[in-house]
Amino acid sequence: MCGSPNTTVGNGTRALILVGGYGTRLRPLTLSTPKPLVEFANKPILLHQLEALVDAGCRQVILAVSYRAEQMEKELKVEADKLGVELIFSHETEPLGTAGPLALAKSILSASPEPFFVLNSDVICDFPFKQLVQFHRNHGKEGTIVVTKVEEPSKYGVVLYDEDGCIKNFIEKPQEFVSNKINAGIYIFNPSVLERIEVKPTSIEKEVFPAMAEQQELYAMDLTGFWMDIGQPKDFLTGMCLYLSSLRQKQSPKLYTGPGVVGNVLVDPTATIGEGCRIGPNVTIGPDVIIEDGVCIKRATILKGAIVRSHSWLDSCIVGWRSTVGRWVRIEGITVLGEDVIVKDELYVNGGQVLPHKSIAASVPEPQIIM
């Protein structure tokens, strides 16, 4: 492994990803697939994180799981082998919150004196793992959390810290402006932090961080670039737009430039797009997708094996695996079609959440769950 010890994690460094919950906010997609395996920009959400960790030199990743672990193990093992990273599944018999999983994996996390990463599985950003190691080693304290700037801090808990990054206080959903920096769900800790946590349901944000901050053992590092918690459909689509914009800034060759494309678009090489289509801005089209002639798609994700019939118009939606959108259909308003959904010809769907294996034969003019 190359790189100076300040910028690349050491051989003994590992990461823990909080996979945990049921993914209820991203239903109906998570009724078919565990949330970490849902494709974001044509790649499972978790794979974005694993690749960034491996790129920073991490060779062992613990997945703290409590739900559908077998499916995740089976699918992720192939990807892990390709990346050359060891995946360890730490099974919770009861939900342990955001701190308990660290205690459950204590024997692995404390096997080396090196610091370890912890991250929430819903986060997508330009992962700053190398910079985080350097910042953490420079201040020499027990923990560092990554913070990011948001437009509406009153929806979140904000972080107050001094010019060196030493955290002074946390304020939950402030009514008056005190800061626009929030916890980005990415951390690095020394193993000594494990002495603060027991194997029981515990919130790291509410029960561990305040005590660390009081002892001046917790620092904040500013994230540059985009960030989004993509755990629900609206934010999933916003995160997709930010991610595609980031690819554009990096002049990524992954962006698609075929006929009828407007703005930032990803298209899997196995997808087919018909004549006279307008695709984009902000669209991802997955493997084996068929887009027929005269289709207009913007701000949307079309997952593997889906079919969009001719002259349909899709905006702000996610089309699930192997779903079929009929001819002359209009879909908008953060509609999510689950797996294997059929939308019949000439319908209007506005904000529908359609459960898997359903066939829709009537328009859905108002947001609702279709069961």
Swiss-Prot record:
The EC number(s) this enzyme carries: 2.7.7.13
Annotated stretches, region: Hexapeptide repeat domain: 256-371
Metal-binding is among the record's keywords: yes
Catalysed reactions, as listed in the record: alpha-D-mannose 1-phosphate + GTP + H(+) = GDP-alpha-D-mannose + diphosphate
Family: Belongs to the transferase hexapeptide repeat family.
Subunit text: Component of the GMPPA-GMPPB mannose-1-phosphate guanylyltransferase complex composed of 4 Gmppa subunits and 8 Gmppb subunits; the complex is organized into three layers, a central layer made up of 2 Gmppa dimers sandwiched between two layers each made up of 2 Gmppb dimers. Gmppb catalytic activity is reduced when part of the complex and binding of GDP-alpha-D-Mannose by Gmppa induces allosteric feedback inhibition of Gmppb.
PANTHER family membership: SUGAR-1-PHOSPHATE GUANYL TRANSFERASE
Name by which UniProt lists this protein: Mannose-1-phosphate guanylyltransferase catalytic subunit beta
Species of origin: Drosophila pseudoobscura pseudoobscura
